[in-house]
Amino acid sequence: MTDARDSRSEERASLRSAIDQTDARLVRTLVERRRLAEALGALKAGDGALVRDVERERVVLDRAVALGREEGLDEAFIEKLFQLIIDDSLRRQRAGLDARVRTATLNEARVAYLGGPGSYSQFAADAHFAGRYSAVMPVIQRDFGGIFEAVEKGEADYGFAPIENTTTGGIVEVYDLLRDTRLKMAGEHHYKVEHCIVGKAHDLGTVRTVLGHPQALRQSQRFFARHPELKIRAVSSSTEALNEALTGKPDIAAVAGRDAARLFGLNVIDASASDHPENYTRFVALAVDPEPASPLLPCKTSLVIVTSDAAGSLVSALDGFRQEGVSLTKLESRPIAGKPWQQMFFLDLDGHEEHPNVARALQVLHRHSVSVHSFGSYGSDRLEPAARATGK
């Protein structure tokens, strides 16, 4: 009996060793594929070709799924795996092109954002500017207006502000500040927000008060509806909430992320505070005179327009995008200060102002608008997954 167990134990160890060796070969193959993709990206840049080739992605994906099917592998598994591989290739090629076109010599960037250590803005800013600059020097602000002002006064190289959330929608304070700014958009970053209740306590039953930024509290309404015994209090930033949870009484907690709890040495008391598990905040980077984005990169363009009061004027202004096959990813209306019942419209579209179809659509927009102001074209960090050919 003992000999049989020993034999099976040796067999398991042998199989695990073989799996480890196979995993190592897989990783080395992925590294080699990445190197090839980067070399291809350099050739594309030299030829002035777009980074993304959707038709080529379909060919790669269809072939991989077909090969997997022949070997008895699940189609959905292969499709998901190669979508991740293609996404990595695109991001590496984009980073390479971004480095080629950037002329800035800053080793570190001064970035104005809301809050401080432990805030979602800090983690998102660090992620966005990583690889672009050797360090991010925070210029901490207590409100959104301070972010814009710091950049306009030259106290920061960039502003970094949340502009919309998948749960609560557009952040109107930021849209209202965009109405009157001379700043341009220099990039965007989609950050996954996972709200937790964090503090010195180990059990939610000992918590009496929970602090958080108003947006975080708004995105956790269902959690607090389930716990009416908790008193909630809005503060100016997640950092303020974390500091009070750290230095205050043990019955005080904060709404923050896991990384913030780790940074402050606090416990994650409850990890289910978010109303929705797929909760993302889109941040925009703002600058006085940002580096121009290459039209070869996946880009977005943002504008604000005012149309006349005539019936159908907005439809006419936007019709060029339909005609030219340009996707509008955002249309947000805001009132015009001092002009009751009149609206301005903020637009985000996929594409660069220099793309011919975008340029033609913008001509139609200008023709049917009272005013048009562009915040510029900038690299988009959101890539739609590669898709197989229709019907496959």
Where are these regions (language model features)?
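Domain-level signature for soluble enzymes in the chorismate/prephenate branch of the shikimate pathway
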Residues: 1-392
